[in-house]
Amino acid sequence: MERITVNLAERSYPISIGAGLFEDPAYLSFLSGKQKVVVISNVTVAPLYADKILSLLDQVGCQTSLLELPDGEQYKNLETFNSVMSYMLEGNYSRDVVVIALGGGVIGDLVGFAASCYQRGIDFIQIPTTLLSQVDSSVGGKTAVNHPLGKNMIGAFYQPKSVIIDTNCLSTLPEREFAAGMAEVIKYGIIYDEAFFGWLEQNLEKLYQLDEDALITAIARCCAIKAEVVAIDEKESGIRALLNLGHTFGHAIEAELGYGNWLHGEAVSSGTVMAAKTAQLQGLISQQQLERIISILKNAKLPIHTPESMSFEDFMKHMMRDKKVLSGQLRLVLPTSIGTAEVVADVPQDIIKQAIDFCRTL
């Protein structure tokens, strides 16, 4: 078992990572007896894991209820958010209630945002069940819902009290979802840790075989990197923006094609190739480094191409709404090597177009 701390002074919290954590109530023992707890999940995850979590809470002495939401990125919106608010209000829950987000990134983002808003803020716990949510979205306090005009445009920075990661959850995850999570795992190597990138190149097969030691190693390294970055820059005014490698292009794909048609990690993978090609055209990385990035994403069974139906104009329409845009100036996260990246402003549009068109040929 690995334990990592996100250091944010009085708002610091632990991340527990291991196999079989859903069998041990110790990870929820910080909850007081008779504590009211609402477990919020979706119709896919709840039948698999809700009873286990409710049983742990019962052993701790909590009073529990379960809310099941529809499953899918298309439900990460204000309508679903409102249904959570209605459930909480109709249940007469006061400010001492704790909510648990049991699911993937959609559940974590939506429930975290609901927790930040309900009666101006209540405690919540992240129990992520997908690889993507375990290595990325459950850590760091970004919470949000989507708007038809842009992804994650309505949200807040709001930290959980604890993150509990049971790697055994990944045994029920479809391979497509696992691959989507690998896009975020690979991202950490590209932007922050060349040695980890090399380790991933050598251990992809073990990860896809769900080797326990390999999974814990990879998830722990990703969480440690994110914890380090968030401790330095919680609200993304500096270094935290680097965690958005591939996301400016990727969010454009999701918004244009409709949320849920491409998984978030699939869009990030395609976006990472476009960002890497942009960097290579700008002279920031070599052809060999570009090829390593493309190769590892391809070997991880991820898309590396541009969606055929999307024009350059489609991309720019959405990218100019990106949260990193300042004073009308598009800023892109670009790799400067394997293991380093920076935010680059004012990339010429013809370079961006070349990068997008390059990915059409892959």
From Swiss-Prot:
GO terms for molecular function: 3-dehydroquinate synthase activity; metal ion binding; nucleotide binding. HAMAP family: DHQ_synthase. Its EC number is 4.2.3.4. It catalyses: 7-phospho-2-dehydro-3-deoxy-D-arabino-heptonate = 3-dehydroquinate + phosphate. Belongs to the sugar phosphate cyclases superfamily. Dehydroquinate synthase family. It comes from Vibrio atlanticus (strain LGP32) (Vibrio splendidus (strain Mel32)). Keywords: Amino-acid biosynthesis, Aromatic amino acid biosynthesis, Cobalt, Cytoplasm, Lyase, Metal-binding, NAD, Nucleotide-binding, Zinc. It is found in: Cytoplasm. Gene3D superfamilies: 3.40.50.1970, Dehydroquinate synthase-like - alpha domain. It comes from the Bacteria. It holds the Pfam family DHQS_C. Zn(2+) binds at E184, H247, H264. Catalyzes the conversion of 3-deoxy-D-arabino-heptulosonate 7-phosphate (DAHP) to dehydroquinate (DHQ). One of its GO terms (biological process) is amino acid biosynthetic process. NCBIfam families: aroB. This is 3-dehydroquinate synthase. Coiled coil: none annotated. The keyword Zinc applies. GO terms for cellular component: cytoplasm. Its cofactor is Co(2+); Zn(2+); NAD(+). NAD(+) binds at residues 71-76, 105-109, 129-130, 142, 151, 169-172. Binds 1 divalent metal cation per subunit. Can use either Co(2+) or Zn(2+). PANTHER family: 3-DEHYDROQUINATE SYNTHASE, 3-DEHYDROQUINATE SYNTHASE, CHLOROPLASTIC.
